[in-house]
């Protein structure tokens, strides 16, 4: 708090006890979950008959949804942009207002809620268009690969989030507000992509409302 010793607070014992309690409760929850839920182990993989759909662990299914549209942008381009953007936030955000507080800075909680609504609406709209109408490859089979790589649901979604963040920075005249908006959109988008990849993708990575709708082999 501040820069001088008179405006500081000791980490011991209050912060240390709080962090230790959270760590112990998290560990206890993970252990209880591991005991209560069995791992979904299947038969030994057969390289001659690959699984369809072959899905990554659930925490990678958001990325797999992006990779389904473009291997390069989904697997390398967009993750690199996200990591670089998150890494730059501490260097770009030099504001002191709201430091150390949840939803601190201009906008506060209303900004987070508005950003969450935009983030959810954007990813749902982009995915709905891709599922209902297809994308460039379906519209134009002879389209060059560079166009498929540059313009796909993942890049469109990234652009929408970036433009919303820039608009937020200008509206609130605050880099922190833009960073908060961008991070909120990223979390909402990744959550929706993970849910879609987990529950609504079937054979050949086609969209199905339920596994009961999958074609019979």
What do these predicted ranges mean?
Residues 1-4, 10-99, 103-136, 144-217:
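Hydrophobic cores of alpha-helical transmembrane segments in multi-pass integral membrane proteins
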